[in-house]
């Protein structure tokens, strides 16, 4: 590439740097600061990894910031949904905290053992949808 003929590579093999806070020490499960609950963190800096995960955290921050302004209790996450599981992950004590993306391994276990992977994922999805409906009802009522 002609335009790069004088380029110098300072460090090989690094595509991006992930900067994040020590969320388990600093954040509550609604992404607000434990010491200053009026301050919220969302996105990569909160310890979630990925675009969708960052958007989900931002949505949770927005909803809970609005609820706080209205004098209402924040929506506390549950490990039944990936959004909730990520929120619990970033706010739970962890000696070696590293950012996490959405994955089935962080979800609250199902009440039953399902060996078929497709059926297990479907069960997780159905449970998450039911829990999301419950949260949406709570948000719209409050």
Show which residues each predicted segment covers.
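C-terminal auxiliary extensions adjacent to catalytic cores
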Residues: 100-142
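Alpha-helical scaffold segments in soluble metabolic enzymes
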Residues: 64, 85, 131-134
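Generic hydrophobic secondary-structure packing signal
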Residues: 50, 54-57, 61, 124, ...
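A glycine-rich dinucleotide-binding beta-alpha-beta segment and adjacent secondary-structure elements
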Residues: 1-48, 55-56, 75-89, 97-103, ...
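A generic structural signal for short coil/turn motifs at secondary-structure boundaries
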Residues: 48-51, 119
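Internal hydrophobic alpha-helix adjacent to the cofactor/substrate pocket in enzyme cavities
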Residues: 54-77
